[in-house]
Structures are given as structure tokens and as C-alpha cells.
Amino acid sequence: MSNSTNNLSSTKDLKRVLGFWDLMAVGIGSIIGSGIMSLTGWGIDDTGRSICIAFVIGGLIAILARSPQIFLNSVARYRGGDYSMVGTFLGPRWTGTYSMIALLTSVTLSMYALSFADYAMPFLPAFTRKSIALGILTLLFITNTFGINAFAKVQNLAVIFLVISLTIFTAVGLTKLDGNYFDPANFMTHGFVGLWQASVLMSYTCDGAQFVTQMSGEAKNPTRDIPRVMLFSTLGVSVFYGL
């Protein structure tokens, strides 16, 4: 094996400081996103109040779809995440194709920044939508230049704040639960077909844990932790959504 290949596969120059809970924060943060806001209404239209079941089924669908990555990351450390997996099994040509596709899809970061700005504008009336979006992108870019430790701390704080907020929202909502919530007239309104359609939609809202594979090179024990994180974060978030 050439020295260049050794350098590409070696992680001896990386800190490898990310433990299970650091990776879990990445997994949860990657799953929870705009899908829960934009698709839940469509799911309710398909299956009514059995949407809670659709979320759990959707989580299982997401795990099944990502099972190849779960299995692959249980046997080896892939320093470049998906890029390394593509390069290992398909060769340099397809690795280049993957890189070009990844570059094109990275423009969606601007969409996330603009969505953040939409939520932040009521609290920051002195700033425009574009300036807030540019500011958050710049802040996150600068954070990443300080290394993986800074990234992990910011990610952990963000996910803790996110989970606390959603927990409060869920707890308050459960106290206002209608006693007739599971009334057959409003449950599985379009039968098993409607439940399946809603589950497929909800699988998108429960997807995203695969991005934790990008942290393989910086993980302490990726073959143990990454598969567990992908499983537990997906199932945990899907059950949480169902509540």
C-alpha cells in the first residue's frame, strides 16, 4: 500500500475525542429538522390521529433504509464518512461523482440558514433576513475552524436546548390531550393504506442519523458507537415525535 493511501486511511493525526454522547448529539441534531413541521399535516390528512403510530413505523423504515451504513460502520472506521465508503467499494470514479453531487447539494445550507432567520427575525427586528442567515452561517463556519472540540461543545449545547424545548412542548401538549383522542372515527381514517402512506412520509422526518458517519475519523470507538447512535437516535426521536 502506498504512503498516500496510508495517509488517507490513517487517523493518527486526528484527535479522536468524540464519545457516544457527542455522537448522539450529532445524530439527534441531524434528525430533528424542518420535516416535522412541513410533513406532519400531510401525514394527519392520510391517517388521522394514528399519526403517532406512523411516526414509529417511519422510524423503522428510516433504520431499514440506512441499514447498509449501520452494518458498514460496525466493522471499520471510515475517516471520510460516506466519501470513504464510496471510495472503498466503488473506486475513484464514483467517489468523484459523489463529491460533485455533495458539492451541489451543499447549497441547501443556505435554505437552513434562511429558515433559521425566519424564526429569529421576531426577536431580532433590527436585522434583515439575509443578514441573520449570513451571520449564523459565518458563526458556524468560524466555530468549525477551532476544531472538533469546539464543534462538539456547540452541538451538545444546541441539542440540549432543542430537546428541553421539545420536551416542554410535549409535556404541555399531553396535559391537554382529548380523552376521545383514539376515537375510531378519527383513527386510521384511510385504513392501512393511509397509515402506510403517512409512515412513508414520516420516515423522512425521522431520517438524518446517517450524517453521524462523517464523524467516524474523530470518534473514539466508531465501530461500537456509530451503529448504536444511528439506531437509538432514530428510534428515540420517532417515539418522541409520536408523543
Report residues per predicted region.
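Membrane-interface "cap" regions at the ends of multi-pass membrane proteins
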Residues: 1-41, 45-50, 62-67
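Signature of the 12-TM Major Facilitator Superfamily
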Residues: 96-97, 153, 227-228
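Select transmembrane alpha-helical segments in multipass membrane proteins
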Residues: 16-27, 91-103, 132-136, 189-202, ...
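Lipid-exposed faces of alpha-helical membrane segments in multi-pass integral membrane proteins
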Residues: 28, 32, 53, 57-61, ...
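Hydrophobic/aromatic residues within transmembrane alpha-helices of membrane transport systems
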Residues: 19, 33, 72, 212-215, ...
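Hydrophobic transmembrane alpha-helices that form the core helical bundles
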Residues: 42-46, 54, 63-145, 150
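Helix-loop-helix junctions that connect adjacent transmembrane segments
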Residues: 9-14, 52, 125-128, 156-243
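Short helix-kink/termination motifs in transmembrane helices of multi-pass secondary transporters
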Residues: 28-39, 107-111, 203-210, 242-243
